[in-house]
Amino acid sequence: MAFHFHKDRDIYIRQQKANAAEFLIPFIEEALPIVEGMHVMEIGCGEGGVLKAFLDRGCQGVGIELLKGKAERARDTLKAEISSGQAIVMNKNIYDIDVAADFSSLFDLIILKDVIEHIHDQDAILSRLRNFLKPGGHIFFGFPPWQMPFGGHQQVLAHRLLSRTPYFHLLPVPLYRGILKAFGETPMSIQNTLEIKETGISIERFERLVRKNHFSVILRTYYLFNPIYKYKFNLTPRVQFGLLTRIPYFRNFVTTCMYYLVQKEA
């Protein structure tokens, strides 16, 4: 069955905010100070937990969320900041936004945390994001490599055994679908899980797309244990062993999370 924090959204929001404050922001600040008044956009802001950590640092924030229910929850999470004019939450597709009409300023920093692996045309979104950034602007990406033990997000499945079984998302689609059906997963759950199988991204593919769309990698960290596991499972975050980070393709299978900071090239 899904873990309790997948169902209790208040716990989930607190975990996301704490993780952003303790790990995500310090990672970014190795190269880019987070200062008051900085313009920050989060794409796929969910219920607003990550963006809240940046607002607490004095940033001006915009949250973009495609799902109406999550956008409404984000507005509740950030109601004080929205009321003061420090933040807005938009229930829109990123491709439907008119940068010049919708915003008074371009952005210093864009955040995509656990989002890029859900987007179908990752090449197109990277190209599109250049339009939102100031010259020399930055993007943070955090994502699980597709081949990692739970890269198929199977931990959210209803069946207890499936939610705890690593790597079975790598099976061929017909067999994968058959197992999900045999263990009683709902049609919606199966559809969502198969969609992730279509959009999962590897370290190598991500870096090729970054270069193709004229971004430079400023920072990268390979995590053996994802920082969010501290809050979900009481596991101490650990960076990946240096030797394993240098083995292309294999590193995807043993790295649970990647953090990147990339910069827009001229």
Where are the regions a protein language model picked out?
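Short, surface-exposed alpha-helical recognition segments that flank or form part
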Residues: 12-19, 117, 194-197
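A structural helix-start
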Residues: 71, 119-120
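Conserved N-terminal segment of class I S-adenosyl-L-methionine
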Residues: 1-105, 109, 126, 225, ...
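S-adenosyl-L-methionine-dependent methyltransferase catalytic module, highlighting the catalytic core
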Residues: 120-128, 138-263
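A short beta-strand submotif of the Rossmann-like class I SAM-dependent methyltransferase core
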Residues: 112-113
